[in-house]
Amino acid sequence: MGQLERDLARHTVVAVDTAPLIYLWERHARYFPLSEALFRHLGEPNVQGITTVITLIEACVYPQRQGRLDLVAAYQRSLQQSRRLRMLSIDAPAARRAVVLRAQYGIHVPDALQIGAALETGATAFVTNDRRLSGVQEIAVVVFDDYLP
């Protein structure tokens, strides 16, 4: 068991940002092993993975722009049918949390919405590769780059 798995072990509701999913889908040379470890954890009994429709948007924009509708469909299918990850809509309570997070930390709106929804759902960890989110204190921000040499 690696350090990422040890750090995630204490979290039963884990929110996942877009990048770890893209690394998994694209089998990214550097980050794929970390994404695999994350999804092993999400497959554990009593562990719930969540993400939001923001991830659907962010993941599908580039392939849509490239005319890769096959990838758009595959990413949508993966998110909608995943047994390890539940995709949430953004509701008013999550948006209100996002307002506070954006005001306090100056983070981008999509990140604030993702974290706001995570907090509203009871997540205690947010897995990302965006170091700018490390300052958020309301949730444990797990940054993939922190687990690489």
Regions found by a protein language model. Name each.
Residues 12, 47, 85, 124, ...:
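A structural micro-motif
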Residues 62-63, 122, 137-141:
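Short secondary-structure transition/capping segments
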